[in-house]
């Protein structure tokens, strides 16, 4: 089962995400939605709902307790397993495939690139274009290099693979990297989820 926008928003809010993570996953989801819509406009089949939900929930394991058993799987795979356990196995591949670590190792990247679905590629690319907002991939990699200076060489190799991914995704969508945009929907979906949760919360009068 693929969660709807409303269901994905509820899953995310259940884990009390901080504002910085909401900004990031919101940007990823909206960039991914834009790319899926552009593919669809060209008659190219893409599961838009899967792309939206995976984009919004791709970092879900960052919100789980450190002692949750799934954390042993590492970032991405942990979130995929957790979502699968809750009835959303369709999201697993796109969530597991998004981390930058997928691009660091040539053999691992080669295996993934040979079997990756269009939805996986879109979500993985959207993550490389979003920090707290839409940004150039060069800015995203500069941020990683600043945070992990000991991995500069491997990040440079990963960037070359990310540029290949960018070419593939953007060519499929029929846009240039400079033309990539966000298709806004996450803010309204989260606001609606918060209103629902507030309305469902028992008041002092109903508790009495």
Regions found by a protein language model. Give the residues of each.
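Generic N-terminal amphipathic, Lys/Arg-enriched alpha-helix
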Residues: 3-18
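Divalent metal-dependent catalytic cores for phosphoryl transfer on phosphate-bearing substrates
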Residues: 13-14, 41-147
